[in-house]
Swiss-Prot record:
GO molecular function, one term: 3-isopropylmalate dehydratase activity
Pathway the protein contributes to: Amino-acid biosynthesis; L-leucine biosynthesis; L-leucine from 3-methyl-2-oxobutanoate: step 2/4
Function: Catalyzes the isomerization between 2-isopropylmalate and 3-isopropylmalate, via the formation of 2-isopropylmaleate.
Quaternary structure (record): Heterodimer of LeuC and LeuD.
Protein name: 3-isopropylmalate dehydratase small subunit
Catalytic activities: (2R,3S)-3-isopropylmalate = (2S)-2-isopropylmalate
One record GO biological process: L-leucine biosynthetic process
Sorted UniProt keywords: Amino-acid biosynthesis, Branched-chain amino acid biosynthesis, Leucine biosynthesis, Lyase
Amino acid sequence: MLIRGRAIVYGDKIDTDVIIPAKYLVYTDPAILGQHAMEPIDPEFPKKAKGAILVAGRAFGMGSSREQAAIALKGAGVLAVVAESFARIFYRNAINVGLPVLQAPGVRAKVREGDELEVDLTGGVVRNLTTGEAIQGKPLAGLPLEILKAGGLLQYLKNRA
């Protein structure tokens, strides 16, 4: 499963309160949530997110277990999130809502804002097409990959019914 897009880069410990502030949790529409994604640290994020790959450092998605964090990123048009490490609950929520995620230690230091990336989920490789570098991450396989291919957990379950 290959995903291509330009990089939007953030640092370590981006928590779910930053990804989608609590005051917007009253909304359920992914597009509305997406308009407010990353608002506390990057008010321009919604303009940059469509067709982008979000790259981050360690502990991306830490904090509360709000599913809306992954929904907001997907609603903003993010194609995938690649981080050095993830909070496990965010990682599972992302897969469950159909937002591709890949853990790739060292990725943050090798990608700059605007670089063109290709993410191979099954091989676990992030290719920086701008610099020619490849970063080996942890490949996705088994049920998590099948859920992503289906478009999320609900669609996966519907397909099996």
